[in-house]
A protein has these predicted regions:
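Conserved beta-strand-loop-alpha-helix hinge in the C-terminal portion
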Residues: 183-189
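Structural signal for interior beta-strand "rungs" in well-ordered beta-sheet cores
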Residues: 2-181
Length: 189
């Protein structure tokens, strides 16, 4: 179902059973999978969104990367099945390097106000709590938990199942299966 107030670009491919809410803007080069809900006032462009996803109000998916070298190249966001992106979250499309893509795995949860910058790669089942921020080119492994208001500098790698406590910030990679907190995160527990 597509609400009559939604604005849909002619190139968009939307599954017949997807739900597009009021005042949603679906821009060019978008694919939306079966049973996915894009709720009121969300903005999506240059993105492939899997099945059974939820994009909450005022989320922005696929806008231009914050990269001074970006010159309008054809880049995108790919979001796996079952992912939930909450209110005011932002996911920028890739910059013109690597595979030109920002990737979010399956069954991830990006809570209110999170930011995933250009060319980031999130594994499956990643949780980003409110206001967690990833700089460009970060890689987050399977099942990692990023606490509220955490900040990760560009190119940081977070290992599988790592847990980073809220209010932490790092320029350093985080080991798999570790727990850390602080600036930079110090192993704990």
């Amino acid at each position: 179902m597509i609400d009559k107030t939604a604005i849909i670009h002619p190139t968009a491919e939307i599954a017949d059973d997807a739900i597009i809410g009021p005042n949603v803007v679906i821009g060019e080069n978008v694919k939306i999978g079966s049973r996915t809900r894009v709720i009121a006032n969300a903005f999506v462009e240059f993105a492939e969104i899997g099945e059974d996803c939820t994009i909450s109000p005022f989320a922005t998916i696929g806008s231009e990367p914050q990269d001074l070298g970006y010159k309008g190249e054809p880049t995108k966001v790919v979001i796996g099945n079952g992912t939930i992106i909450k209110e005011n979250a932002t996911v920028h499309r890739g910059a013109a390097c690597g595979d030109f893509t920002t990737r979010i795995g399956e069954k991830c949860l990006l809570m209110v106000g999170t930011h995933v910058a250009h060319n980031c790669v999130l594994g499956d089942q990643v949780i980003m709590a409110n206001l967690a921020t990833l700089g460009g080119h970060c890689h987050v492994g399977f099942g990692a938990w990023l606490g509220g208001m955490t900040v990760f500098h560009q190119n940081v790698r977070v290992g599988d199942m790592a847990i980073i406590s809220g209010f932490s910030a790092t320029r350093q990679d985080i080991l798999p299966y570790s727990k850390g907190e602080g600036r930079p995160p110090v192993p704990s527990g």
